[in-house]
């Protein structure tokens, strides 16, 4: 799983680890996919709305800025139960209030 993988100014130190994470997930998916094991790579490009996160990261942001944990869990559940004929690998989640 990944928190963010897009390039961003002043975040170059973070980019190499995220690229490595994605490539590792691809390798695992190719190794285990033929055995019927679905590997998906999730990018959660958002501040996740928790009691601790909101006051620390963005106390003045509206609700639309945050990803809700139940919505993230629903999407992960949906992907985990996909038909093998239409498996997703890379799934990006972000709230509509996020600037990207």
Language-model-derived ranges and their functions:
Residues 3-20, 26, 30-33:
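Catalytic loop of short-chain dehydrogenase/reductase
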Residues 4-6, 45-48:
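Active-site segment of SDR-like NAD(P)-dependent oxidoreductases
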Residues 10, 51-55:
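Short aromatic-enriched loop/helix-cap "lid" or pocket-rim segments at secondary-structure transitions
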Residues 21, 25, 53, 72-73:
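A general structural signal for well-ordered alpha-helical segments in protein cores
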Residues 21-23, 38-47:
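Short, functional N-terminal and low-complexity linear motifs
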Residues 49-50, 100:
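A short beta-to-alpha transition loop/helix N-cap that caps and shapes the active-site region
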